[in-house]
Amino acid sequence: MIHRLPNDSYYAATARGLPVQPQLTGSMTADVCVVGGGFTGLAAALACAERGLRTVLVEAVRIGQGASGRNGGQMIPGLNVYARDLVALLGHDAAVALYRLAASARDRVHARIARHDIACDLRHGHIHLAAKARDMDDFAAEADFANAHLGPGSAAIIPAADIGAHVGVSGYHGALLTPSGGHMHPLKYAEGLAAAALAAGV
């Protein structure tokens, strides 16, 4: 049974849409069959086609219909736990490996957008505001870890006095700036991946 999600999201209202593709009838032969037209399926289909594999993607409803086309669109660097906590949990080498893996995933998204000229309203940079003074200690440690293991300039601390220049508000104790983060229109990105996959022969 397919759970039908409503089509009336902001993203659906502001996306361009794709030409209707033929419905699968009968049988088809391919090297790879990808099931699902979300980010993972689209990226997999595109990668397979770019490697010369005959690739078919099947989607029950429409491209980006599920979570891929409805998420917040944020590309937030790092993980959902501070680096020093991850080091305590898994050890230094594993923490570094996970951070680098997350960074490489984000870099792949940026590279796909650039390579295929995907117009998905991409904006660069992410700011994590410090609501409490003690947040700044966590942010400083996070910035040090990112700069040491992902390269200089991967993160920076914004002092409280400069917050207004970045986000137009005051009252915060400072912030953590990660230039490699950002925001995009997720459904436009999904449609761009689909267009690239179609052009590659999917």
Q: Where are the language model's segments positioned?
A:
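Helical element adjacent to the flavin cofactor pocket in flavoenzyme catalytic cores
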Residues: 137, 144-147, 171-202
